[in-house]
Regions:
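Signature of alpha-helical transmembrane segments and their immediate interfacial
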Residues: 1-31, 430, 498-550, 607, ...
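Extracytoplasmic/periplasmic membrane-proximal domains and adjacent transmembrane bundles
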Residues: 6, 37, 48, 90, ...
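Transmembrane helices with small-residue packing motifs
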Residues: 12, 19-55, 113-123, 377, ...
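Hydrophobic transmembrane alpha-helices and their membrane-interface caps
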Residues: 24-36, 342-411, 418, 450, ...
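Flexible hinge/switch segments at interdomain interfaces of large molecular machines
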Residues: 34-45, 81-87, 122-147, 175-181, ...
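Solvent-exposed, membrane-proximal periplasmic/extracellular interface segments of envelope transport
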Residues: 58-130, 191-212, 233, 571-653, ...
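Helix-loop junctions and hydrophobic alpha-helical segments within the transmembrane domains
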Residues: 319, 326, 330, 406, ...
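Transmembrane alpha-helices and their membrane-interface boundaries in multi-pass membrane transporters
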Residues: 395-409, 431-450, 457-499, 605, ...
Length: 992
């Protein structure tokens, strides 16, 4: 007695098992988290260290190199990159996916703490954070007021909003864009300082000595103990202005005599506006692998709670929210599930033309789909685009077994058999075929388990959900379906009018198919040239179809990065960015929001469009219009960017090609030639390189002999320049219970030309004032403003956007050609960002494709105990793949991970249909029929079930192939590949 017979004999048992599947599936659905994609973020740890006033070369040698040297030994590192720039070093450590984030963070902290003894004493301690320093924020809260200054808004954002949001689970950091943090600015006048014989170092020492509060002990009496507190801290600009610096001829010299103190912003070279209104933005950056929707929901909840804490004249809004696209995309896929379900039911009814027979698959489909959520739950997955796509694909797959089982039982009932016996006999005949098709479909997805990197993580969840759905549907088909069939199906004495009207069509179809099959079986040799033609078509089209990681999606967001020539002032880049902002306003006046942000050297404009349903143009069209328009804005450079599907880095182009060399001189020599070839290549647009050699600098060459003779040391000179010009922190002060910086610097009006520096004085060891011009020589030069390392090599990353119609695969091929023409054997090349993910996913998907073919062949061989029968089935695979490629080429679909996974699915779908015919043919041969007759009978008998299941699969995927709304392009890619492959293969499969 098999499980089908047991279920027929014990219907309550079969019903209970089905209810348990439904119950567990519903519980799983209600407890699963929601996100856009499976967690595919590599663990990334960032190390930052500040050293005010130091240039890139000093930062690289004294900070970056010691830190990198120690970090490099940590196991599991995928890439180690760094940037050394004026006053700061940033190191990004990317680990393999298998490494735990907390373990990685602890390892990095340990290595950084060991390296600290090699760092300069007066640099800030390095900070370690669990996120990429360039990670994209998922949400921005805009804080605005008509009556308050940006200083006040920044304080509210910091003390009220940021404090609350950074405690949300899985948030890596909360930053304030456009922040004007309070500081005590000490503006120095070099002329007055020279007159009073005071240097910037004297001011620093006075601050250190006069702004201090140390523990002072206590007074202990017999009955009372009093704690002493020395009130040495200063809190107001007036107190700082009154600091006594020295006494000259009986006259006290205060700070107000050589400058002035004011409460002002620490960062005076930045601003931020949203829709033209100055504001500050609180942005939330998630940890790698975090659930973005849960974080966004928590932010909304916290902001609602904070309403009562904000002043009445302070308003907040959401500048952007990336989770809107995620929610809409998931909702679109969910609606696709319902559409697919309805279409599948319609096709089943059109074929069976009996509501009782149709009712059985209608009941079985939800069992398999709901059960899939239990598979997600026990595997620790989430509801995301890929798991929901798996559910959509399952609609067409899970119905197959139910249709085949129901149809086989129904035929026997129509022949006069009692439902009970028909159920047992029909289930027994089809039992092995159902098991075989299930194993075959599951085997298709087994290779995905072995895939590494981003693509492996992405489609592991997809494959498990499809495989789980198919296994559950197979179980339901072998238990619940035959039981239902024996209860619902009856022999009709007279068929309904719809059946009678349509039966001639099906009988005619059978006759035409029988004639075609007989004709082809007499000319079986034609199968070989047809297969060869299809293989040639595959070879040609595979090379013609452009490849990329994932199709670009309309996320209703565009970003424009602006950059000026090296050495350009903050005001210059600010004016250029505002010019681009005005241009954007003229091109898309109905944008939901336009946020402009500028800091020294660069700017960014983030455009948030209306929802897709509220506009009649696409994000890509707007991006192209802006790209064309900004070409006329030549004062500086602007780069239009659109976020990739799997990109998490801010401001990164799709093509990221890294050149590595042993010395910066070699890079300086080859970069101009390399870049000129990239600029001339029509594949690229908006190309740029991060390593520049054109930043103007003034080198101070010290005459050591002269300085020594006059009693001045190199430290005296360096500290005077450091505290006078770099904006170095001189200490801290407290206001409203919070700590802020004290920043000293010479007035900008008195340090805006090289000649101003010559008038600065230093004090010798004899107490004499010496003009700096007497000890040093000023030489104008150029140097890189930023120095880059990639995997410990000095590097330069060439970034490029892609011309309209070009893909990342074509871009990387062109980069490889340029590198071969330009670089010698001492150079290395590497990929970064989306380019690296694409290259890794391409190789692993090809491996999965080949392994799927081998596994299915071996499994079929084991099932049929023959190496020949599986080969017959496998010959139909090229038909499906060729069909998929033809439809993709005609529809302009790229070869991406979505279309490729659809092609891998086709292998199982086509093999499944082949099993049904070959299995029945073998059974008939065992029953005594000759080979050719067995083939004819099996093909004719399985014609309707195969057409029905194939049509169900195709119609179940039609909503994907014609998808609209958020996330449509990836659904179209997968749907087109599977639908195209099924349509072409079914035309030829039933004959071949």
């Amino acid at each position: 007695m098999n499980i089908s017979e047991l279920s027929i004999r014990r219907p309550v048992l079969a019903t209970v098992l089905t209810i348990i599947i439904l119950l567990f599936g519903l519980i799983g659905y209600n407890t699963l988290g929601v996100r856009e994609y499976p967690s595919v973020d590599n663990p990334i740890i960032s190390v930052t260290c500040s050293y005010s006033g130091a240039n890139a070369d000093v930062i690289e040698n004294q900070i970056t190199e010691p830190l990198e040297q120690n970090i490099n030994g940590i196991p599991g590192i995928r890439s180690l990159s760094s940037v050394s720039q004026q006053g700061q070093c940033r190191i990004t450590v990317e680990f393999e996916l298998s490494v735990d984030l907390e373990t990685a963070a602890n390892d990095v902290r340990d290595k950084v703490s060991r390296a600290q003894r090699y760092l300069p004493r007066d640099c800030d301690p390095p900070t370690v954070s669990k996120a990429d320093a360039d990670a994209t924020p998922i949400l921005m809260v805009a804080i605005q007021s008509d009556s308050r200054s940006l200083l006040e808004l920044s304080e509210i954002a910091d003390l009220t909003v940021k404090e609350q949001l950074q405690t949300i689970s899985d948030v890596s950091s909360v930053s304030i864009w456009g922040e004007k943090r309070y500081s005590m600015r000490l503006w120095l006048d070099p002329t007055k300082m020279a007159g009073y014989g005071i240097t910037p170092v004297d001011v620093k020492n006075a601050i250190t000595n006069e702004n201090i509060e140390l523990p002072s002990g206590s007074i202990e009496g017999n009955t009372v103990e009093l704690t002493l507190r020395t009130m040495g801290q200063m809190h107001t600009a007036k107190e700082f202005n009154n600091i006594i610096l020295k006494e000259v001829g009986g006259r006290v010299v205060r700070f107000s005599d050589i400058g002035y103190a004011e409460l002002g912003p620490a960062d005076i070279k930045s601003y931020m506006k949203m829709n033209g209104v100055p504001m500050v933005g609180v942005v939330v950056i998630p940890q790698p692998g975090a659930n973005h929707i849960e974080i966004a929901d928590a932010v909304y909840q916290r902001m609602e709670q904070m309403k009562k804490d904000l002043p009445d004249d302070v308003k907040y809004s959401y500048g952007f929210d990336n989770t809107k696209f995620i929610r809409a995309s998931i909702d679109e896929v969910k609606s696709t599930v319902y559409e697919a379900f309805v279409l599948v039911i319609i096709i089943i009814f059109l074929f069976l033309r009996d509501w009782r027979v149709t009712l059985i698959p209608c009941i079985v489909i939800p069992v398999s789909l709901i059960g899939a959520f239990f598979v997600m739950y026990i595997a620790g997955f989430s509801i995301n685009v890929l798991t929901m796509l798996a559910v959509v694909l399952s609609v067409g797959l899970v119905v197959d077994d139910a249709i085949v089982m129901t149809e086989n039982i129904y035929i026997r009932i129509e022949r006069g058999m009692r439902p009970f016996e028909a159920g047992i006999e029909g289930a027994k005949e089809i039992f092995f075929a159902v098991i075989s098709t299930t194993i075959t479909l599951v085997a298709v997805f087994l290779p995905i388990v072995f895939m590494e990197g981003t693509s492996g993580r992405l489609f592991r969840e997809f494959s498990f959900v499809v495989a789980g759905s198919v296994i559950i549907s197979s179980f339901a088909a072998l238990t619940f379906t035959p039981m239902l069939a024996t209860k619902l199906l009856i022999k009709r004495e007279k068929q309904g009018w719809f059946y009678q009207k349509t039966e001639p069509f099906f009988e005619g179809m059978n006759r035409i198919y029988a004639r075609s099959l007989n004709a082809f079986l007499k000319r079986r040799i034609w199968a070989i040239p047809v297969t060869v033609i299809m293989l040639i078509a595959i070879g040609v089209l595979w090379g013609q179809i452009p490849a990329e990681m994932a199709p670009m999606e309309d996320r209703s967001q565009i970003s424009i990065n602006t950059r000026a020539a090296e050495g350009a002032s903050y005001e210059y880049i600010r004016d250029y960015t505002e010019d681009i902002n005005n241009l954007v306003d003229s091109i898309i006046p109905d944008a939901e929001s336009v946020t402009a942000r500028v800091s020294s050297g660069s700017g960014n404009i983030r455009i948030t469009l209306k929802d897709i349903k509220d506009r009649d143009y696409t994000q890509m069209e707007v991006a192209e219009r802006i790209s064309q328009a900004i070409r006329n804005k030549t004062k500086a450079r602007a780069f239009v960017q659109q976020q990739s599907s799997f990109g998490g880095r801010r401001g990164s182009m799709p093509v990221q090609y890294v050149l590595q060399a042993v010395s910066i001189e070699k890079l300086e020599k080859v970069l101009p030639d390399f870049l000129s070839k990239v600029y001339d290549n029509p594949t690229f647009q908006m190309a740029d390189v991060d390593l520049k050699f054109s930043s103007p600098e003034m080198r101070v060459n010290i005459n050591r002999d002269k300085a020594g003779t006059m009693g001045a040391t190199v430290r005296d000179i360096a500290e005077t320049l450091q505290y006078g010009l770099s904006g170095q922190r001189m200490g801290y002060f407290y206001m409203n219970g919070k700590q802020y910086e004290i920043l000293g610097q010479i007035n900008r009006q008195q340090r805006n030309t090289p000649a101003n520096i010559k008038s600065i004085y230093i004090r010798s060891d004899k107490g004499e004032m010496i003009q700096l011009d007497n000890l040093v020589e000023f030489v104008e030069s150029v140097a890189p403003p930023k120095l880059y390392h990639y995997n410990r090599f000095i590097s330069a990353t060439v970034s490029a956007g892609l011309a309209d119609g070009k893909t990342i695969g074509q871009g990387l091929e062109e980069m490889d050609k340029i590198a071969a023409q330009t670089l010698d054997e001492t150079f290395r090349t590497a990929l970064s960002g989306d380019s690296k993910d694409y290259r890794e996913s391409s190789s692993s998907l090809m491996f999965a494709f080949i392994l799927a073919l081998i596994l299915i062949y071996l499994i079929l061989a084991a099932q049929f105990e023959s190496f020949k029968d599986p080969f017959i089935i496998m010959l139909t695979v090229p038909l499906a793949i060729a069909g998929a490629l033809i439809f993709m080429y005609a529809g302009g679909i790229t070869m991406n991970i979505f279309s490729q996974i659809g092609i891998i699915m086709l292998i199982g779908l086509v093999a499944k249909n082949g099993i049904l015919i070959v299995e029945f043919a073998n059974q008939k041969q065992e029953g005594g029929e000759n080979k050719m007759q067995a083939i004819r009978d099996a093909a004719l008998q399985r014609l309707r079930p195969i057409l029905m299941t194939s049509a169900s699969t195709v119609l179940g995927l039609i909503p994907l192939a014609f998808a609209t709304g958020e996330g449509a392009n990836q659904r179209i890619a997968m749907g087109t590949a599977v639908v195209g492959g099924m349509l072409v293969s079914m035309r030829l499969f039933l004959i071949l």
